[in-house]
Amino acid sequence: MDQSVLNRTLELIKPCPGLLNHVQEVAKLATHVSGTLGLNEKTLKMAALVHDVGKYSWPQELHSKYPLYTRDLQIVRTHPLVGEKILCEFWPEIPKTIRQLVRWHHERPGGLGYPDQLHNPPIEVLVLAACDVYSAITSDRPYRPGVLAVDQALIEVAKFAPPQVVAALADAISKQCVNY
């Protein structure tokens, strides 16, 4: 990824409360987990750093609003597609894998995710999703404190991620890739 593309993307998300820290934490975790599983660390790291760029399009108040109502959830669920579009504009030669990871980071096995309801998301998608969910659960948000219990957060991740991903994530956490 061209450094200027990464810089432009990170500049977009800076005004979003906590988002820059979140994507940096997800990138650290995803790099460790992908390395443990023999996946492409560079690809997962790049995708993690830009996976939430679509949140840039949200109304500012949505970043700290709770609870979210039906209309709010409709907006929230657009961010993978908006992020993919932004990246394609910034980076016309974006690798297909990174584009797909950004688009699919909320996909879950059995067609339970969005935006495409994939039944069998690729392992890379589940790695990014697991790291994203872990970071989201354990981080403080304007409307709630983060969960402090690592085990509690990993139980949530295990609801959709394969055991090898959960184990690699637990290893990353134990090696203090992130604060816990």
Regions found by a protein language model. Name each.
Residues 2-180:
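Histidine- and acidic-residue-rich, metal-dependent catalytic cores
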